[in-house]
A protein has these predicted regions:
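Bacterial Sec-dependent N-terminal signal peptides
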Residues: 1-28, 86
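N-terminal leader/linker segments that initiate helical-solenoid repeat arrays
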Residues: 20-84, 88-107, 122-130
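Generic structural signal for well-ordered, non-transmembrane alpha-helical segments
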Residues: 107-110, 114
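Extended amphipathic alpha-helical interaction segments
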Residues: 117, 125-136
Length: 136
């Protein structure tokens, strides 16, 4: 009987925590860097998660699509966008089938560094010096 009560308490606690986690107010100013309105912010935050998952799963075509959207709509939202973008293009460079593809991916990688430099040049730890050092 005690174990049943314990199991029920844990189950109710888990349901309560999951319900709390879903109530994000995207109109909150702290999410402004993710987009122009609440719907765009929500979608860009999801795109950031999809980008990470696509890179981790080596689905580079999908990852490139998510990265493009994030760089256009919310370039200053998170450093992780650039970390995943750099990972994406470094892997694409290594997998390039010819010199033309390799040059295209190198150009894309340099573009990611340039946009990161514009968005995070004044970051205390990962600012301009760090970015330029990695770009070389």
């Amino acid at each position: 009987m005690k174990s049943l009560k314990l199991i029920l308490m844990v189950a109710f606690a888990m349901v309560g925590f999951s319900a709390m986690a879903q109530n994000i107010n995207y109109d909150d100013p702290k999410y402004a860097k993710w987009g122009a309105n609440a719907e765009q912010r929500k979608q860009n935050m999801l795109n950031n998660q999809f980008l990470k998952e696509a890179v981790d799963n080596k689905n580079y075509k999908a990852a490139a699509g998510y990265l493009k959207i994030l760089l256009e709509q919310s370039p200053a939202a998170a450093q992780g966008i650039y970390t995943n973008g750099i990972k994406l293009y470094k892997n694409q460079i290594n997998r390039a089938e010819n010199d033309e593809q390799r040059a295209m991916f190198i150009d894309s990688l340099l573009y990611v560094y340039d946009v990161r430099l514009q968005a995070f040049a004044d970051h205390s730890k990962y600012g301009a010096d760090y970015i330029l050092d990695r770009k070389v």
